[in-house]
Swiss-Prot record:
Gene Ontology MF terms in the entry: ATP binding; ATP hydrolysis activity; four-way junction DNA binding; four-way junction helicase activity
Annotated binding of ATP, by residue: 18-19, 60, 63-65, 126-128, 169, 179, 216
Organism: Rickettsia typhi (strain ATCC VR-144 / Wilmington)
EC number assigned by the record: 3.6.4.-
Protein name as it appears in the record: Holliday junction branch migration complex subunit RuvB
Phylogenetic placement of the source organism: Bacteria, Pseudomonadati, Pseudomonadota, Alphaproteobacteria, Rickettsiales
Chain's role: The RuvA-RuvB-RuvC complex processes Holliday junction (HJ) DNA during genetic recombination and DNA repair, while the RuvA-RuvB complex plays an important role in the rescue of blocked DNA replication forks via replication fork reversal (RFR). RuvA specifically binds to HJ cruciform DNA, conferring on it an open structure. The RuvB hexamer acts as an ATP-dependent pump, pulling dsDNA into and through the RuvAB complex. RuvB forms 2 homohexamers on either side of HJ DNA bound by 1 or 2 RuvA tetramers; 4 subunits per hexamer contact DNA at a time.
InterPro entries the UniProt entry points to: AAA+_ATPase, AAA_lid_4, DNA_helicase_Holl-junc_RuvB, P-loop_NTPase, RuvB-like_N, RuvB_C, WH-like_DNA-bd_sf, WH_DNA-bd_sf
Amino acid sequence: MTNILSPEKSENDQELPIRPSYLQEFVGQQQIKENLLVFIKAAKSRNEHLDHTLFYGPPGLGKTTLAKIISNEIGGNFKSTAGPAIIKAADLAAILTNLEKNDVLFIDEIHRLNTLVEEILYSAMEDFELDIIIGEGSAARSVKITLPKFTLIGATTRFGMLSNSLRDRFGIPMRLNFYNTEELKQVLNRASKLLDIDLTDSGSEEIAKRSRGTPRIALRLLRRIRDFAVVDGKLRIDKEICDFGLKRLTVDSIGLDSNDYRYLKFIADNYHGGPVGIETIAAALSEQRDELEETIEPYLIKIGLVKRTPRGRVITIAAFEHLKMPIPNKSQHQFNILNENE
């Protein structure tokens, strides 16, 4: 699924020269920032490495950025890879043996590590040792390699898919949450200054309200609205040009797009509001289940349009009202039951 409101990273997002380098520049996630400052300061004062850190939560909230910031704050090199890229034990060994003291190894999508690689990672995280097999057959022998004290930072959007053994080895687990409108305005205002964009307060507010609580989406929308402003001869990005551009991008007043409407209308039209299983929804919409669970559902659940139940997905009264559709009696009964159980 590729669209303007996808929280997943795209190649175009990487061109923005606005990534903060230190915690004081990072907007939002205030409690995480404050705690990280304490943990980093304490590790430095003891002349120790920072404990292994796990960032989890919806995509687009700053997990990679925070990993790079930690590297800058502790003064180590930053090495980056992804779970699916580490196929064999030898791949992991090559990465680990090239680390230096206080380096940060960032593994994105760490929930996608295969079991064999994950088991080798345990001793590297706990004991800073790596056991590798040299040779084959009867000539094979195990060699223990001592690793420098490094910090592993894992990132995942699927916390529940991590094994307990891997989760327990992270001394600093941190959940990143969606941003509120004011925080997104701060992100946009900072970016507009760095990109030399004249963004009004009303324009910033309009983009922030429709960015699904996600900085990556807010910055992407800012770039696209800048395009509309340039072509339209506008020197300033205000509420009017934002509203025009966002309508052209089919982003509605609360940040929903055509993919969200397809999802909601399928449940409303075909199942009277639900419940309906996620596999059925994915098949009907020709989407992967993971895509729905990671890019569409989190925001719809956050704003109260969808509920996950043991029997499947249910859309709420608020969803019917936003769709401007009548509420079926069957669904009304289900909503009453759900509300009583909350």
